[in-house]
């Protein structure tokens, strides 16, 4: 029987792995992969871009670089990425299967929960968190966290916290926040037990020794991730540390750390998803008291993650209010606090909670209604309800929220069936489900014809939960399949296919026609230069050093190279590199090339209307005549000879 269960678990993990491939597949390199993979290769081979300022900066994910980078001794970069993706997605599949089975021990249901989880985290995150993606430190941390939580909800605390310690070693924030949320869940459980004990209820848990052993062992293991992170500010003055924190939070990573800077749709969709999770918190699964206790521990874990996010919201919104009220003199302290990614935990726990809760509720409602999900009564009873849920989704999206947004934005109303999932579609669906769910819960409480109302409410709840558990994930998987079957451009390249091809052409030219020691300046947001051209670059917006001193120097360099010094605020970063070069003029650019030892500059071709601006056209022609060595339809390469600049 044990072997049978293991084979079933392996088959479920294989199916989840297929879903992970569907959501995670993108051409190499994906977002952040040049960053993490480059660091990992450089860890074992210091000669790999030895002159690159980012790769030679301090390492914050030491264990990940040490373990993953070891395979770079045998594999080329592209093969290394595919090996890493396959390993991470496979480990994640097994980890999720363990967590799902710990809460919902039904054959095959971990596949349904995985499909729902991948869908909800893809479309309803607040601050950009993901679980299935490219090769980086948090990707390998999540499987250990999931596995640890599977043990945690079963009260096997020694193994749980050891696994969470391993997760922390690979990524201190992913694992560390998980440990704190687990401890918060235990604290809530202890408070509940104390209240029940005082009322003559249950005794103490008797798991203290096991818990301490797990925390001690996991804490020691986590030092592999914690100590490098703590060392990042070492040697920097308090002023430099604070400046680095401000740069990191408000200038570079605000889209992950500062919700007030995000589009309002991000906040609305996450709020709606949180309300859906609260809706499923009322659900009590069938089974033993032990099974219900596991769900309580999981729900408390999610609740603590939301409390953590609430603290982050206070640092973001509350501190400015305190300053305005005169209760706080320095509002910049928020940067020192927000840098700890307060929304990273809830960004995945709430989607996971909805995925697990909706699937469990749908299964229980099916049993209570007298039909099995895979039984004979499924097709005549459950499928029409799911179809109705899909119709509600389309109607709500078309007639209500999408129309309101179109009016507000003075845009055309989107079509009935969108070509790809969009935040508006997802928000509309959740809003519709919430409205119907609240209505049917209210109907259930009305006295009178109890049997008819009970049948109606059960059918409606089955429709709501089935739509959440099956219709939405299936829709997302279908749209993802359609998108991935088309022409894909690496997300680290320029987004448009023609521009991406031009980018690859200029990268190939650089690799074939410049020395390996050459240093380039390239457009600010193009992160795949080193990957394709195999040449170093002086700076990159994506590749922000992690130690405080290097971060401050990096930011000053970015300001000097990528802004004109005229514009202020965030808009100063909006100009393409060619516009910055034309604003500075050839002599100033040459001086900067000499100062920073830049051999080549890769810039976008100027816009077609440059001919209507004589002075700008004159500057461009002068620059091209003196420095151009290559160009294609989209990019131009300028070469600077440093020896000719002495004395300027």
What annotation goes with each model-predicted range?
Residues 20-37, 44-45, 49, 53-61, ...:
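Transmembrane catalytic cores of multi-pass membrane glycosyltransferases
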Residues 470-486, 496-579, 586, 590-610:
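Short periplasmic/luminal acceptor-recognition loop of GT-C membrane glycosyltransferases, typified by
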Residues 149-151, 158-175, 183, 216-220, ...:
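Membrane-interface alpha helices of multi-pass inner-membrane proteins
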Residues 304, 308, 312-342, 349-352, ...:
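Transmembrane helical bundles and short interhelical boundary loops of multi-pass, membrane-embedded
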Residues 52, 74-94:
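Loop-to-helix entry region of an early transmembrane alpha helix in multi-pass inner-membrane enzymes
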Residues 96-124:
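Transmembrane-helix signature of polytopic, membrane-embedded enzymes
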Residues 37-39, 54-77, 167:
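Short hydrophobic/aromatic helix or loop-helix immediately within or flanking a transmembrane segment
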């Amino acid at each position: 029987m044990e072997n049978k269960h293991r084979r079933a678990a392996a088959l479920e993990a294989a199916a989840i792995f297929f879903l992970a491939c569907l959501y995670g597949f993108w051409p190499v390199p994906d977002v952040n992969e040049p960053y993490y993979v480059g660091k990992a290769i450089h860890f074992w081979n210091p000669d790999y871009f030895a002159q690159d300022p980012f790769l030679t900066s301090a390492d914050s994910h030491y264990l990940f670089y040490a373990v993953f980078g070891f395979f770079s001794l045998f594999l080329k970069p592209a093969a290394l990425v595919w090996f890493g993706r396959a390993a991470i997605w496979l480990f994640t599949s097994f980890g999720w299967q363990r967590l799902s089975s710990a809460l919902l021990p039904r054959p095959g249901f971990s596949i349904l929960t995985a499909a729902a989880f991948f869908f909800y985290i893809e479309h309803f995150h607040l601050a950009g968190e993901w679980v299935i993606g490219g090769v980086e430190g948090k990707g390998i941390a999540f499987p250990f966290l999931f596995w640890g939580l599977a043990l945690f909800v079963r009260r096997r605390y020694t193994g749980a916290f050891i696994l969470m310690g391993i997760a922390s070693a690979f990524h201190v924030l992913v694992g560390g926040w998980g440990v704190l949320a687990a401890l918060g869940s235990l604290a809530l459980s202890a408070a509940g037990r104390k209240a029940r004990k005082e009322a003559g209820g249950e005794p103490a848990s008797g798991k203290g020794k096991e818990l301490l052993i797990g925390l001690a062992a996991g804490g020691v293991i986590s030092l592999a991730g914690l100590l490098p992170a703590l060392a990042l500010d070492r040697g920097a003055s308090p002023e430099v540390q604070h400046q680095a924190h401000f740069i990191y939070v408000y200038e570079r990573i605000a889209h992950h750390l500062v919700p007030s800077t995000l589009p309002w749709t991000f906040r609305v969709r996450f709020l709606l998803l949180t309300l859906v999770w609260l809706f499923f918190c009322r659900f009590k699964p069938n089974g033993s008291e032990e099974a219900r206790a596991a769900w309580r521990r999981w729900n408390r874990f999610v609740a603590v993650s939301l409390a953590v996010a609430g603290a982050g919201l206070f640092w973001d919104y509350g501190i400015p209010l305190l300053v305005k009220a005169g209760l706080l003199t320095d509002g910049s302290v928020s940067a020192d606090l927000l840098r700890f990614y307060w929304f990273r935990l809830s960004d995945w726990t709430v989607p996971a909670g909805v995925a697990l809760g909706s699937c469990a509720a749908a299964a229980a409602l099916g049993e209570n209604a007298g039909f099995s999900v895979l039984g004979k009564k499924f097709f005549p009873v459950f499928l029409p309800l799911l179809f109705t849920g899909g119709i509600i989704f389309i109607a709500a999206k078309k007639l209500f929220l999408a129309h309101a947004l179109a009016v507000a934005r003075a845009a055309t109303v989107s079509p009935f069936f969108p070509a790809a999932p969009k935040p508006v579609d997802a928000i509309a669906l959740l809003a519709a489900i919430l409205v119907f769910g609240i209505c049917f819960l209210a109907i259930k409480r009305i006295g009178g014809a109890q049997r008819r109302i009970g049948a109606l409410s059960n059918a409606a709840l089955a429709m709501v939960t089935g739509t959440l558990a099956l219709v939405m994930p299936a829709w997302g998987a279908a749209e993802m399949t359609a998108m991935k079957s088309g022409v894909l451009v690496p997300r680290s390249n320029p987004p448009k296919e023609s521009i991406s091809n031009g980018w690859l052409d200029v990268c190939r030219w650089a690799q074939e026609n410049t020395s390996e020691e050459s240093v380039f300046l390239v457009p600010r947001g193009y992160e795949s230069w080193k990957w394709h051209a195999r040449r170093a670059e002086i700076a990159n917006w994506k590749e922000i050093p992690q130690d405080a001193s290097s971060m401050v120097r990096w930011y000053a360099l970015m300001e000097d190279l990528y802004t004109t010094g005229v514009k202020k605020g965030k808009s100063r970063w909006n100009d393409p590199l060619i516009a910055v070069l034309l604003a500075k003029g050839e002599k100033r650019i040459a001086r900067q090339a000499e100062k920073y030892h830049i051999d080549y500059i890769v810039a976008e071709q100027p816009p077609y209307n440059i001919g209507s601006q004589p002075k700008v056209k004159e500057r461009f022609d002068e620059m091209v005549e003196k420095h151009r060595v290559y160009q294609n339809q989209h990019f131009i390469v300028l070469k600077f000879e440093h020896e000719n600049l002495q004395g300027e």
